[in-house]
Amino acid sequence: MPDWSDVPLLYQAQIEGRCQLQRQENKQKSPAYDWVDQWTKFYHSADDSGGKSPQPDNSNQWRRNLSPVNRNNSPEPPQFSEEAKTRPYTMTWRLVTNGGQDDGIIRPAMGARGYPYYPGSSMKGAFRRACTTEQALKYCGKPSQGDQGSEPGILRFLGGYPTDNNWTRNLVDIAHPQQEKQVIQDGKTNANVLLSFHEVTLNFGISSTISLDEQEWRTIWQIWEKAIGNGLGSRVSAGYGRFKDVPSPETLLQVHLKGQGITATLLDKTSEFRPNMFKAALRGHTLRLLGGMTDEKTAKHLTQILWGGIDGAATLGQLGISFTYHDDDLKFGEHPYTPPGKSEQIMPLYNLKRGTLQISCMNRRTSPEERQELAELAKAIVQFSLLLGGFGKSWRRADHWQFFRPYLEKGNKPMIGCHWKFIDSSESLYLPITDLQQDLSRFIDRLRTQFHNYAAKQGYTIHPDNPVHCDWREAWYPYDNQGGVQVWGRIVEDRIKAIAWFHQPYEGTHTLRNLQGSIGRDSQTGRLWHRIYPYYHSNSEGKLQRQKPPIELLTFFPEPTEDSAHFIAFLNERSDFVKIW
């Protein structure tokens, strides 16, 4: 009788004792990696090219028959016939498609000889959505209606195939929802495994049933680029499914950024710069602000309308993001440290010299007036994000390498914090400050009013001063001795002060230990954010001028404890911080 362990994991049941791709115990290697290794080992090249095959070109050699019979058992990617027109496009990051062939895991569809591909049917759907009505009828055909049969269009969509075997790299991805932990309350969260293409070049093929001239083919490819500009596959609003040098036709806002911090890691501890962290931050701040103005159900629903989600029925949000950068502008590093009594640890770091965050309208039918309102709201949320925090891991804390290096010099402390900046034309997004308290409090009040107006457009009546609010750790409403938030700030005339308070008593024997959060097995999210923000004046011509001292900002979500009460009294009576909000 055959041994069940000889059966490839691909064909084993997702039950205990067989193949549980979503289960990882005692820091062991996830079964997903063995699953992927069994699938992809045949496709790795034996040469020194790292699995690469020649890139496609427009020659007839590339357009050979896509025939698994002729080239069975070949590790070379499938190729199109001579009649097909093809173009390669490279992903900016990852692409998620669900073949729907496995229980409990999302993975790409598999075609001839086990190659993953982007299905022609999905390609046709994306193309049709980018067409005018006339173009859709001509190219894609007329679907059947009642007694009337369907009429085929002139185009045949052949799908998209990897141009080389680099698709086998970095397939294991994770979806790690943390909204509950980040905003509402601490709790255990699980990272779910999925398989997605990572920075793969796909060659897309289209053929026609009739002869077309070059001008018409240019029109067809323009429509296709409009389609992929909106993103392909799933999770496009979080930065998946985007392609290099193909801008979104629905872009509302472009923000140029630079930043440094701690790199995210996958299940196997591989570090990866993950652009979905931008949407996570913007969505999280939306939920915080709405949570301070209305009840939980309404706050979550309005957040889902704006950014999308799967709470209840899956919803395509009004806004989505993509993030692009040149490879030369992103550098990775390491921070080694040895905690007392333990072995050396390595923390992966990133330093991004320049990148562009694009925020797009996800609904093409949105009116020009509503687009403008969404653009203004998105701009304000981005400004709020960089005013009080950052993006990615450790976003609540100021970058210690830049602002508190002595803490790291002994080599026994982990890296903490991040630091993000507006650059180039986006420097205009910095808030000009004449009066620290008035200018920043007005900005926060104005943003809350924008959310009030947004909610009204969705049919909800809320008000910034509404006494109804969510009982969350980080719901954004004025502190009332039970919950809420306070923002404190100071212009740094001498030195940055608060960064040291997280590591030593800030007054006498009083520390922030119970307020700053912790990492490890029993991690807790801190109630304090600390940000070093550039100080800009607006001159007589309305142009921003950078001032030498920065601004130090503390955002505090107090709880009804003695630690919180003492720290508030200290800030108010015995520090040079002023209460901003």
Describe each PLM feature range:
Residues 1-581:
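Basic, Gly/Ser/Thr-rich N-terminal segments that form RNA-phosphate-binding interfaces in CRISPR RAMP
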